Amino acid sequence: LRMLGALECDATTLGNHEFDYRSSGLAGALNAARESGDPVPAMVLCNIDWKSMEAEGLTEDQQLLKDAFAAYGMRDYIVLNKGDVRIAVLGVFGEDSLACAPTCVLKFQDIKEAAARTVKEIRETEDVDMIVCVSHSGTNEDPAKSEDELLAKAVPEIDLIISGHSHTTLEQPLQYG
């Protein structure tokens, strides 16, 4: 996170490898980055399912992460001003990412539903020129498993999806809508 901040990255989201050292490792990394005083990017993620986890009673690890996310300032989205352009940036964490993070204790909502809800909120409450999604969901040769392509089709109000997770090189951008 400190390196991303040094590179002047404005926003990021979580990926499956953030859970490699369990909840305590992720919480520790977030807290250390925040406490360093160095610039760090905003953390955006709109599809954590806190409601269902809280209904069941948060585990110690879930509470640890909730506290670390709050202290870091994680939000569903942020709005950036780049010159005369206002850009909303939201983040999502996909199903395949979760499948690749066996130590993750969090529950997540469907990325399409969460992104649609967040985009609706952005459009109703913010005056933005563009909506960008940073996604750790990925693309896949199998269209039924290509989460970011499915997201683009389901939520056409998203202008740009910056897709991570699958390490796919695209020679040309994928365009929908």
Give the residues covered by each predicted segment:
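Acidic, metal/ion-coordinating pockets
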Residues: 1-177
